[in-house]
């Protein structure tokens, strides 16, 4: 049977307040600022921040955006933590529940993210000394017990795979129905993980802490076949 491919696009160009409202801020500090500057979100986070796209994602899909860590002498201009969660949810009674629900504890603290099941990539974490990929398993014991924290599945520590100041990175994340998820940055494949228990439905969040970052060109591409 002939296969036809249909591409459905959800585009976020940050052109209006309505578009900005598609993002939900989960911040540890009340001093956090997410401002709209032209076609770009300008994010100042004195402490932990998860910026959630409110619409859930379903595999197969591709996530694309451009991001920059600003180092221009400001109080939060620290070169670190261009991170993200994808296909994130809170499992409740066998169902994938939105991390944005009021019933879900969301403080902006990084340790509270262990309540999620998701994929996580920390690019230039730990003061720009590591780039790491993990799969979170919603083990809430990990919040207080390091022994329960998810293992590192992929790690880079060389300078070629750490952050450069004021550089605009192109990020592409692919989620396939067969359990494969891929993370590319500037067209370089950093992660190709085959998950034996695939996460095919969930939410995306841009994650950072104590930094000044910019985000633009948000796009989700769905491919469906028949």
Language-model-derived ranges and their functions:
Residues 1-22:
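Bacterial Sec-dependent N-terminal signal peptides
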